[in-house]
Amino acid sequence: MKLREVLQHPGEIIPLLQMMVMAYRRKRKPQDPNLAWCWETLIKVSRSYVLVIQQLPEVLQDPICVNYLVLRGLDTLQDDMAIPAEKRVPLLLDYYNHIGDITWKPPCGYGQYVELIEEYPRVTKEFLKLNKQDQQFITDMCMRLGAEMTVFLKRDVLTVPDLDLYAFTNNGPVAICLTKLWVDRKFADPKLLDREDLSGHMAMFLGKINVIRDIKEDVLEDPPRIWWPKEIWGKYLKDLRDIIKPEYQKEALACLNDILTDALRHIEPCLQYMEMVWDEGVFKFCAVPELMSLATISVCYNNPKVFTGVVKMRRGETAKLFLSVTNMPALYKSFSAIAEEMEAKCVREDPNFALTVKRLQDVQALCKAGLAKSNGKVSAKGA
């Protein structure tokens, strides 16, 4: 975190300090060395995710930490381009059969995940300490996710429905299994079990933001990883690899705004899902990443920096949003504020201007109606 950046935004100093205090107070300090290693590793591979997990009821924190590391191993296997696709398919399909084997570790590893893979049996030891029901949740998740991941090792993303499916394959099974866990612990409405579509939209919204933000890294891979659908980029470019070239900036921005506008359609079902979460900690666990995704869309909109590096929100901005998520009315206000802010910077010359504005106005109207409904419930209780 840069001091100059903090001083340039003094309104973010207090939220940053509050976040630091919260992180310190909620830091897990397990006595068990393997469990302590799991938490330390989670901090290394996904620092931002740690504080979200720490919002959960204490009974869920260790299982979700272990779950994340198990899935990170699976994700590392999926993305390891050093392994030919035809060899990765059976490995992904069989992954779930090995997560209880203390002698096994995923046959992959690169970058920041090398230590996780090398020490993977430590994750297995903690997995085996979980109750049988939590072990089964994680096993089911890996079985379904591994199967879904193989789909796009064999096919390309050509259409918007393909993008929906790709975003779902990387997050959907996780969202569905976590929903079952929330309901099983009586932290969410059982009706969510009949609405896998809502879990799917939660997953797709998160998945698409990652696909959008990682475009430069993906097209520079050898061979390139093409997750933006040709149905979108083909309207502006002949070759998606041109999207990072300065001479194609106008076309690249139109393409970017198009795919961002597509992602906005997931917001309504995401809000419907979060309305059905009862527990405050689980609510925050679900709501914070979705809110950050909308904020990231706003930051990325018409932003050429998407094609020159990774676009990130300031830590102070992140802290303010994180602290704003206290309940559903507060979430409505935050979603509406970001949508209004993004609408104000929409570019009239953009080919998708009208649709982008409409979807953002729909979000604001939805949040306004949700707030009115919430206020009505409060009034009824007080009557």
Swiss-Prot record:
<dbReference type="InterPro" id="IPR044844">
    <property type="entry name" value="Trans_IPPS_euk-type"/>
</dbReference>
<keyword id="KW-0560">Oxidoreductase</keyword>
<dbReference type="GO" id="GO:0045338">
    <property type="term" value="P:farnesyl diphosphate metabolic process"/>
</dbReference>
<feature type="binding site">
    <location>
        <position position="312"/>
    </location>
    <ligand>
        <name>NADP(+)</name>
    </ligand>
</feature>
<keyword id="KW-0479">Metal-binding</keyword>
<comment type="function">
    <text>Produces botryococcene when coexpressed with SSL-1. No activity with farnesyl diphosphate (FPP) as substrate.</text>
</comment>
<comment type="similarity">
    <text>Belongs to the phytoene/squalene synthase family.</text>
</comment>
<dbReference type="InterPro" id="IPR006449">
    <property type="entry name" value="Squal_synth-like"/>
</dbReference>
<dbReference type="GO" id="GO:0005789">
    <property type="term" value="C:endoplasmic reticulum membrane"/>
</dbReference>
<keyword id="KW-0460">Magnesium</keyword>
<dbReference type="GO" id="GO:0008610">
    <property type="term" value="P:lipid biosynthetic process"/>
</dbReference>
<feature type="binding site">
    <location>
        <position position="72"/>
    </location>
    <ligand>
        <name>NADP(+)</name>
    </ligand>
</feature>
<protein>
    <recommendedName>
        <fullName>Botryococcene synthase</fullName>
        <ecNumber>1.3.1.97</ecNumber>
    </recommendedName>
</protein>
<dbReference type="Pfam" id="PF00494">
    <property type="entry name" value="SQS_PSY"/>
</dbReference>
<feature type="binding site">
    <location>
        <position position="314"/>
    </location>
    <ligand>
        <name>NADP(+)</name>
    </ligand>
</feature>
<feature type="binding site">
    <location>
        <position position="213"/>
    </location>
    <ligand>
        <name>NADP(+)</name>
    </ligand>
</feature>
<feature type="binding site">
    <location>
        <position position="79"/>
    </location>
    <ligand>
        <name>Mg(2+)</name>
    </ligand>
</feature>
<dbReference type="GO" id="GO:0016491">
    <property type="term" value="F:oxidoreductase activity"/>
</dbReference>
<keyword id="KW-0521">NADP</keyword>
<feature type="binding site">
    <location>
        <position position="75"/>
    </location>
    <ligand>
        <name>Mg(2+)</name>
    </ligand>
</feature>
<dbReference type="GO" id="GO:0051996">
    <property type="term" value="F:squalene synthase [NAD(P)H] activity"/>
</dbReference>
<feature type="binding site">
    <location>
        <position position="47"/>
    </location>
    <ligand>
        <name>NADP(+)</name>
    </ligand>
</feature>
<dbReference type="InterPro" id="IPR008949">
    <property type="entry name" value="Isoprenoid_synthase_dom_sf"/>
</dbReference>
<dbReference type="GO" id="GO:0046872">
    <property type="term" value="F:metal ion binding"/>
</dbReference>
<dbReference type="InterPro" id="IPR002060">
    <property type="entry name" value="Squ/phyt_synthse"/>
</dbReference>
